C-alpha cells in the first residue's frame, strides 16, 4: 500500500501568484506545509529599477536542478514510499495535489471535468496577469487595456470567460451542490478559480468597473450571481480559514515588477516605501 505524505515543501516567490492555489490545497488537507519564500530584489540598470531573482536562481535552484532538470517556481518537494520527489510547474503541482489529496473527482467523468475546469481557470487568470505585468506609456493606455480585460473576462456572452463558469454552475445536475465546480466535493479547480476571482475582485474595485459594490456582492452586480455565491461560500470554508488567517493570504497577488497587484502601500510596488518582510519560510501545521 502506498504511504501518505506527511509534509510538503512548496517553493515560490513572496507573492500569491501561481503558488497560491497549491498552498491552499495543502493547508486545506491538513498536511504540514513548509512554504519556502524567494524574493526578487531591486537593482538599478540603465537608470531604471529592475528586479532580479538571485535568491532563487543562485541558491536552491542549483541543487534542485540536480533532482529535476525542469525545476522552476513553484515546485513541490516531498517524500513518498521512502523516495524523494521534486516536481515543478503550477498545473502539474495542482493536478498532482488534487489526485494525491482526493481533490480531483470521484470517477473518470469528474476527473475529466477537473482537467477542463483547471485549464479554463488558468485561461481566466492569464487575461488579468498579462495586464498586471504590462507597463503602459500613459494612464490612458492603461485604462484602455483595463477595459479590454474587463470585456474579455466579464462580457456576458459566448466570448466572455467568466460566463463559462456561471453557465457551468447553472447547468450542474440539480442533485449536486453548486458550492463546488465538480460533483459534491472540493477539487483543484475550485482553489484556482477562487484565487483568480480574488485577484479580479481587486481589479474590479481599483478600476471601479462595478458601481456601489461591496466585497460580498461585486461579482453578483457584475452579472454573475452563481460565481458570486461560489466565491462567498469558498472563502468561508472552515478548513480554509487557517490559510485565510495566515501570512500567505496577506502576500501581494503579483511580483514586484508588476504594475498591478504588487504593492503593499498601493496597487504597485514602490521600492522607496515598500519593504518585503516576508520570512524565508512560513510553516503551517
Task: Annotate the PLM regions.
Residues 35, 243-244:
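Intrinsically disordered, low-complexity regions enriched in proline, serine, glycine
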Residues 212-220, 226, 244-262:
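C-terminal/domain-terminus segments
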Residues 247-285:
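Acidic/histidine-enriched, glycine/proline-rich intrinsically disordered or flexible terminal extensions
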Amino acid at each position: 500500500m502506498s504511504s501518505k505524505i506527511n509534509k510538503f515543501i512548496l517553493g515560490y516567490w513572496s507573492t500569491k501568484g501561481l503558488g497560491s492555489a497549491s498552498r491552499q490545497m495543502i493547508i486545506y488537507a491538513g498536511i504540514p506545509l513548509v512554504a519556502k519564500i524567494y524574493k526578487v530584489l531591486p537593482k538599478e540598470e540603465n537608470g531604471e529599477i529592475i528586479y532580479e531573482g538571485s535568491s532563487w536562481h543562485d541558491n536552491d535552484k542549483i541543487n534542485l536542478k540536480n533532482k529535476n532538470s525542469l525545476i522552476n517556481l513553484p515546485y513541490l518537494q516531498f517524500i513518498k514510499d521512502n523516495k524523494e520527489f521534486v516536481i515543478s510547474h503550477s498545473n502539474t503541482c495542482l493536478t498532482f495535489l488534487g489526485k494525491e489529496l482526493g481533490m480531483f473527482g470521484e470517477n473518470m467523468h469528474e476527473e475529466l471535468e477537473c482537467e477542463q475546469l483547471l485549464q479554463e481557470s488558468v485561461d481566466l487568470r492569464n487575461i488579468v496577469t498579462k495586464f498586471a505585468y504590462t507597463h503602459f506609456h500613459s494612464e490612458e493606455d492603461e485604462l484602455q487595456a483595463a477595459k479590454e480585460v474587463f470585456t474579455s473576462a466579464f462580457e456576458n456572452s459566448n466570448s466572455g470567460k467568466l460566463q463559462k463558469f456561471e453557465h457551468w454552475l447553472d447547468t450542474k445536475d440539480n442533485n449536486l451542490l453548486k458550492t463546488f465546480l465538480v460533483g459534491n466535493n472540493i477539487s483543484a479547480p475550485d482553489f484556482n478559480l477562487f484565487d483568480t476571482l480574488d485577484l479580479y475582485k481587486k481589479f474590479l474595485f481599483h478600476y471601479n468597473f462595478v458601481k456601489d459594490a461591496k466585497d460580498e456582492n461585486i461579482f453578483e452586480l457584475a452579472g454573475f450571481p452563481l460565481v458570486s455565491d461560489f466565491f462567498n461560500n469558498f472563502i468561508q470554508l472552515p478548513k480554509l480559514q487557517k490559510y485565510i488567517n495566515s501570512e500567505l493570504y496577506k502576500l501581494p497577488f503579483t511580483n514586484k515588477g508588476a504594475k498591478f497587484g504588487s504593492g503593499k502601500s498601493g496597487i504597485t510596488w514602490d521600492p522607496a516605501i515598500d519593504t518585503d518582510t516576508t520570512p524565508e519560510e512560513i510553516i503551517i501545521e
